[in-house]
Amino acid sequence: GDPDKKARMESVKLHQAWVDAAAEMGCHSIRVNASSAGSREEQLKLLTDGVTQLCEYSEKLGINILFENHGGFSSDGAFLAKLVDTINLPNCGNLPDFGNFYNRTTETQYPMYEGTEAMLEKAMAVSAKAYDPVPNKPYYTQHYITPVVFDFRKMMHLVFESGYTGYYGIEYEGENLEKNEKAGILRTKKWMEEIWAAY
């Protein structure tokens, strides 16, 4: 989504190498960042141009191009849902991340449940992210720096209700990541299994 056309085309070319690598490894998708500059509508236009070209290349290799909510306007699930609809190609979709609806640059918290629902309409992967548990609130998880708190069970129910049947990635971003990452991932996996069993 670079505003400079030459730089945008160079970015498309660089991403083609990742598409090639993904195809070689037998992957179904690569994740890209919806990064750009300008107004919301300007970014939508620039991203549509660059990613459409990447999708046309990746389609020949059977690779999907997925957007993850990951900073800037992309932290808004409604923006990514509109972007995928605008590109309107079968190998372009979304990868909703449960925890990435907070834009640290602008300190904006986008609606996470509504954003997840919007992205799930054309989701091709899901990142089941959790932080640290909230005491006495089952399945609630809270980031240790940002004001992000959410109901992990509700997020999982949104995925179930959407009819999504693809892959889940499990991600943990709690406090003292280096020390606690494995335990955090295993706890998140346990939550998922409990929620599935009770649904």
Q: Each predicted region: which residue ranges?
A:
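Histidine-acidic metal/acid-base catalytic patches
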Residues: G26, T52-Q53, S74-Y199
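Active-site acidic/histidine proton-transfer and metal-coordination neighborhood
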Residues: G1-N94
